[in-house]
């Protein structure tokens, strides 16, 4: 958020009354009577109330605004879900930015701060659309879509977006992915040509990097991968349930096929979905995935360690994703079990490792 300080200024009724120590640098701390940033400190209830005031000003003052409330994601729905429900009840419009998301991405802060469930909690609020973008172009597309929903389509909606603090390469936006981003999933990269078995790998947030690592590991065993980016399991589920309802009410007409089924419906190809959130998040689409579906998530309390160690601990790193794919292929009869055993030995992983979700 630091670049925003100098450009937009932190709101202060009397302006800046002192010279900050970083006043000579480009991204300096700047307060202004015309500042657009409200810095509320460790005051979740007060900050959320300020957000509600701005998010409802289109109706209370006939003055539309687009508020962005950025916070430690663990202290969003975990702390003020009742206020967010109140915001929805007041037909608020705006963006809730769950920064420092991910049970392994915010490393080193233990069980108090490491959030792996806010996306699940967000889905309980009927006015909230919950997103988990992996790349900058996904984030930009989601924000543009959100503003259009609020003030183009005149919908009273809130958009919760999981944001992370891990640096990794941001690719250019591929052609023709806007619809998939908004509907919750799109094909990032198809399987290369060849004769080897195919798996479908689904990633979101920074764990997409682990998915890409798994692709390389699987290639070493002659396995080809399709890569999907899941920007919103909640939106996929919402549409899936709507299609199920329509089909139930119109039994004599052709069935509607939800987007997730169009993406992952081939029963012959195993699907592996991995997330830096609880397994229940990607598991929201299970009923529309017809093939062998494996979900990897971060159930349990957080830990203080490096990201690499945490992702090994929660079994969501590239090795875990690759092993899950190989296991599914053994189950489907596409490869021999000796391939899986060879990979286990190569990665130094034991089948007798304790389930960390057990207390």
Name each model feature, range by range:
Residues 2-124, 130, 138-144, 212, 282-283, ...:
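Thiamine diphosphate
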């Amino acid at each position: 958020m630091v670049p925003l300080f100098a450009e937009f200024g932190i709101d202060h009724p009397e302006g800046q009354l002192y010279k900050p120590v970083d006043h000579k640098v480009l991204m300096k701390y700047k307060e202004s009577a015309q500042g657009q940033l409200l810095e509320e400190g460790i005051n979740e209830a007060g900050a959320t109330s300020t957000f509600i005031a701005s998010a409802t000003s289109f109706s209370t003052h006939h003055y539309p605004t687009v508020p962005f409330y950025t916070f430690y994601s663990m202290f969003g729905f975990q702390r003020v879900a009742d206020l967010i429900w109140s915001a929805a009840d007041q037909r608020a419009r705006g963006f809730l930015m769950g920064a420092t998301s991910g049970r392994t991405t915010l490393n080193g802060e233990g069980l108090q701060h490491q959030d792996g469930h806010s996306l699940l909690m967000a889905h309980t609020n009927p006015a909230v659309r919950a997103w988990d973008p992996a790349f900058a172009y996904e984030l930009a597309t989601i924000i543009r879509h959100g503003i259009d929903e609020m003030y183009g389509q005149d919908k009273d909606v809130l958009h919760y977006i999981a944001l992370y603090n891990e640096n990794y390469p941001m690719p250019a936006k591929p052609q023709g992915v806007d619809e998939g981003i908004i509907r919750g999933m799109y094909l990032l990269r198809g399987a290369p040509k060849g004769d080897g078995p195919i798996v479908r790998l689904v990633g979101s947030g920074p764990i997409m990097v682990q998915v890409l690592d798994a692709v390389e590991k699987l290639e070493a065993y002659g396995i080809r991968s399709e890569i999907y980016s899941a920007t919103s399991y909640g939106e996929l589920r919402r549409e899936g349930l709507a299609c199920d309802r329509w089909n139930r009410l119109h039994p004599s007409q052709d069935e509607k096929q939800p987007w997730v089924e169009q993406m992952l419906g081939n029963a012959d190809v195993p699907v592996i979905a991995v997330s830096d959130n609880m397994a229940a998040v990607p598991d929201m689409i299970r009923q529309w995935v017809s093939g062998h579906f494996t979900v990897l998530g971060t159930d349990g309390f957080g830990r203080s360690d490096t990201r690499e160690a945490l992702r090994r601990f929660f079994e969501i790193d590239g090795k875990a994703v690759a092993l899950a794919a190989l296991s599914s292929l053994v189950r489907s009869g596409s490869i021999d079990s000796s391939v899986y055993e060879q990979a286990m030995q190569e990665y130094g992983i034991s089948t007798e490792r304790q389930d960390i979700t057990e207390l």
